[in-house]
Regions:
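Active-site-proximal beta-strand elements of phosphoester/diester hydrolases
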Residues: 25-31, 51-54
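Cap/insert and terminal regions of metallo-dependent hydrolase folds
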Residues: 37-116
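Active-site glycine- and acidic-residue-rich loops that bind
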Residues: 28-40
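Short, solvent-exposed coil/turn elements at secondary-structure transition points
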Residues: 16-18, 33, 104
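Metallo-beta-lactamase
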Residues: 1-29, 77-95
């Protein structure tokens, strides 16, 4: 473990793969966008399971149409395509809804909903 900002009790340990924080909360590394970007699988009591993609997949449109973000965010487009496949496999495995990092339509759709 390493200290953050030289604060001895505030530490972190690099992770690779999945890290189960609780039965209903799993962190996972994502293989696109930037090194170290983390996704979250959250299992809720009354509303099913959710996968949060953070910055790895920006929008539902990008996810469904396999449209990688522009520029040099990913090393290659294949890196993005491979990651979308991973998320789709997780979505099927956990019967989960996917929450995208920058989707204004999804924000509007879910803006006033409470999930527990």
């Amino acid at each position: 473990k390493q200290n953050i900002c030289d604060i001895p009790r505030l530490t972190y340990a690099p992770m690779n793969g999945e890290l189960k924080l609780a039965d209903d909360l799993i962190l996972f590394t994502q293989r696109c966008h930037t090194p170290g970007v983390i996704g979250i699988l959250a299992k809720t009591k009354n509303n099913g399971n959710f996968i949060f993609t953070s910055d790895a997949i920006y929008t539902k449109e990008s996810y469904e149409n396999l449209t990688p973000p522009g520029g040099t965010i990913n090393k290659t487009d294949d890196e993005f395509f491979d990651h979308v496949k991973t998320i789709k496999d997780m979505q099927k495995k956990y019967n989960a809804q996917v929450v995208f990092g920058h989707d204004p339509n999804q924000y509007k759709e879910w803006g006033n909903k409470v999930v527990d």
